[in-house]
Amino acid sequence: MTTPFKRVHLIVMDSVGIGEAPDAAAFNDEGSHTLKHTLEGFNQTLPNLEKLGLGNIEELPVVNKVEQPGAFYTKLSEASVGKDTMTGHWEIMGLNIMQPFKVYPNGFPDELIQEIEEMTGRKVVANKPASGTAIIDELGEHQMKTGDLIVYTSADPVLQIAAHEDIIPLEELYDICEKVRELTKDPKYLIGRVIARPYVGEPGNFTRTSNRHDYALKPFGKTVMNTLKDNNYDVIAIGKINDIYDGEGVTEAIRTKNNMDGMDQLINVVKKDFNGISFLNLVDFDALYGHRRDKEGYAQAIKDFDERLPELIDNLQEDDLVIITADHGNDPIADGTDHTREYIPVLMFSPKIDKYHELSGDSTFSSIGATIADNFNVELPEFGKSYLNEMGVEH
């Protein structure tokens, strides 16, 4: 059976939200608007995102509304009860997460720390949100002397364990993380990811190694990616995507170093012949700029992404569809360091389409997954609606 688009390239600009969601107040996020606040005062233009119609979704600084947008455009609000990366991505692929992952801005509960200490026979130090490099600078020497576990978190629902490779061998650190992963599946903790963070070096000159290992949770149901894989389509995960879904529904995983490397890897994939989807997460917006409330850096990162779009577009095949979206907000002028509950922008375009218009909004990110499933004639997810008819695409 032929499909309207042979390939779909899905790009998630991690945290690039487009205004407070209808239920933002319930998340203490009233007034949040990542794109607007990031671009206020920015003295450069975003010509390629403007041409696609980003400024048609919502009035934005720097990005004007255009008469003839180069993409279908809309915005979606989140149905799931959460505003983290895993929840947003899982919803994009058709799930509705009713029990949110937990974040720990004041560190983990004493009860959990005690359980970790009893289970491992090692004392826990730190137990606070911290930058991974800063925490080993602060406690790395102590850890080497004592063999304690450096346990810390971030603004995401993660528990990270740092240890010097000469003091706690990798196998032991991995074993500890596996056991902590089991502990934290308990609904009272519900931590999205446990991460082994080994490091080497001497006091004053520690470096984290590439032996990091993530212990994620599998999605709580069958995603559109699973359905595509089951139907022998390619699902190429680029960047954080493989980790976010714990490998579920992935046929090939490609690691990335940063946003620009992510775009390089995507363009390499686009040049190859395959049948299915590529799925890229660009994490720098969130990790380097949103959480750090670095408005200028965030705006420049959007500019850098904008500059890569012509190269992507030049390499597309006639029957490719590109979808650009986000997974939550992370307003750089909001209080604290957490994500913000926002609408996500959606831009969809293909070389085979020359006329575009606004699409109706929806109250779930799953409409992205539903559109992809519909395109490939596979089972649609329980949530979301396909946009193919609104796009005027015969299928």
Swiss-Prot record:
Identify the cofactor(s): Mn(2+)
What does the record give under GO molecular function? Answer: magnesium ion binding; manganese ion binding; phosphopentomutase activity
What UniProt keywords are attached to this protein's entry?
Cytoplasm, Isomerase, Manganese, Metal-binding
Q: Where do the annotations place Mn(2+) 2 binding?
A: D286, H291, H339
Instruction: Tell me the compartments it is located in.
Output: Cytoplasm
Q: Which Pfam families match?
A: Metalloenzyme
Keyword Transmembrane carried by entry: no
Query: What CDD domains does UniProt report for this protein, alphabetically?
Result: PPM
Q: Which residues cross the membrane?
A: none
Q: Which domain of life is it from?
A: Bacteria
Query: Which Gene3D superfamilies does the UniProt entry name for this protein?
Result: Alkaline Phosphatase, subunit A, Phosphopentomutase
Q: Which GO terms describe its cellular component?
A: cytosol
**Does the keyword section mention Nucleus?**
no
EC numbers, comma separated: 5.4.2.7
Tell me the cofactor note: Binds 2 manganese ions.
Q: Which catalytic reaction applies to this protein?
A: 2-deoxy-alpha-D-ribose 1-phosphate = 2-deoxy-D-ribose 5-phosphate; alpha-D-ribose 1-phosphate = D-ribose 5-phosphate
Pathway entry: Carbohydrate degradation; 2-deoxy-D-ribose 1-phosphate degradation; D-glyceraldehyde 3-phosphate and acetaldehyde from 2-deoxy-alpha-D-ribose 1-phosphate: step 1/2
Q: Which InterPro entries match?
A: Alkaline_phosphatase_core_sf (IPR017850), DeoB (IPR010045), Metalloenzyme (IPR006124), Phosphopentomutase_DeoB_cap_sf (IPR024052)
Q: Which BP terms from GO are recorded?
A: 2-deoxyribose 1-phosphate catabolic process; 5-phosphoribose 1-diphosphate biosynthetic process; metabolic compound salvage; nucleotide metabolic process
Annotated Mn(2+) 1 binding sites: D14, D327, H328
Q: Which HAMAP family match?
A: Phosphopentomut
Functional note: Isomerase that catalyzes the conversion of deoxy-ribose 1-phosphate (dRib-1-P) and ribose 1-phosphate (Rib-1-P) to deoxy-ribose 5-phosphate (dRib-5-P) and ribose 5-phosphate (Rib-5-P), respectively.
Family in the record = Belongs to the phosphopentomutase family.
The name of this protein is Phosphopentomutase
What species does this protein belong to? Staphylococcus haemolyticus (strain JCSC1435)
